[in-house]
Amino acid sequence: MKQFIDFIPLLLFFIVYKLDPRTVDVAGHELTVGGIYSATAMLIISSLVVYGALFIKQRKLEKSQWLTLIACLVFGSLTLAFHSETFLKWKAPVVNWLFALAFIGSHFIGDRLLIKRIMGHALTLPDPVWTRLNIAWIAFFLFCGAANLFVAFTFQSIWVDFKVFGSLGMTVLFLVGQGIYLSRHLHDADTTTPKTED
């Protein structure tokens, strides 16, 4: 459910971007709908609404949600202010690389790896497995950032499609792979845990 909520602003961004540009009258002001700049405005507004509603309901946002919201506001505002989509193209790479940096930092700062802090309440795994998982997430975020950057500046006609659905596809594939990897280790943990007598 959380992943779907986080996806709402990006989906609205995609829908508005794909509209044929047209001029509409809103309270006496002419606004252009369709294309990158109105889509960017929609991304900013919908992000504020979605995360604002989450904050009101939960009384907090996760750190990853704060980072996503701040990046959206910063890069989106720069895109609109300078009328240049270059800023927005850097948003996904920067956010992904900051996530990678956080996972890297947890190897040196704190008493637990970041992936263990996130998933440790639900899973019991050996420390070497947690280490491999953390490294896998680092590699994933670094790759996603590089892929987004490459597509954004190389394939102008499809970068928005990739930003929305390519990133989602990579995430789904990675999570499936992680699930397969974890299922093997969880099975091993079950078979090595002594069973109690009824």
Curated annotation (Swiss-Prot):
InterPro entries: YciB (IPR006008). The chain crosses the membrane at residues 36-56, 67-87, 90-110, 135-155, 162-182. Keywords: Cell inner membrane, Cell membrane, Membrane, Transmembrane, Transmembrane helix. It is found in: Cell inner membrane. GO terms for cellular component: plasma membrane. It is a multi-pass membrane protein. HAMAP family: YciB. Plays a role in cell envelope biogenesis, maintenance of cell envelope integrity and membrane homeostasis. Belongs to the YciB family. This is Inner membrane-spanning protein YciB. The lineage of its organism: Bacteria, Pseudomonadati, Pseudomonadota, Gammaproteobacteria, Pseudomonadales. The gene is yciB.
